[in-house]
């Protein structure tokens, strides 16, 4: 008998913060405001399960909303790389 793999939506897991791909126009504005090049942001691999789930491609910028016990909600950005 063939075994079925169990699937679940990783984005619904309680430990995974909200991720979203930033539109190109907004990404350009964010990069300009931060005064960095996209590749200077922390990296997120395109093969990361969450990157795959949200459809992030190399060159995209991903916004992540994290909950912090000391700072409340924190927004961080990641640059998607292909390796």
UniProtKB/Swiss-Prot annotation:
A GO CC annotation recorded here is:
DNA-directed RNA polymerase complex
List the subcellular locations: Cytoplasm
Catalyzed reaction equations: RNA(n) + a ribonucleoside 5'-triphosphate = RNA(n+1) + diphosphate
Q: Does the keyword Transferase apply?
A: yes
Recorded GO terms, molecular function? DNA binding; DNA-directed RNA polymerase activity
UniProt keyword Transferase, yes or no: yes
> What PROSITE patterns does this protein's entry cite?
RNA_POL_H_23KD (PS01110)
Q: Which family does it belong to?
A: Belongs to the archaeal Rpo5/eukaryotic RPB5 RNA polymerase subunit family.
**Name of this chain's protein:** DNA-directed RNA polymerase subunit Rpo5
What's the source species for this entry? Hyperthermus butylicus (strain DSM 5456 / JCM 9403 / PLM1-5)
State the encoding gene: rpo5
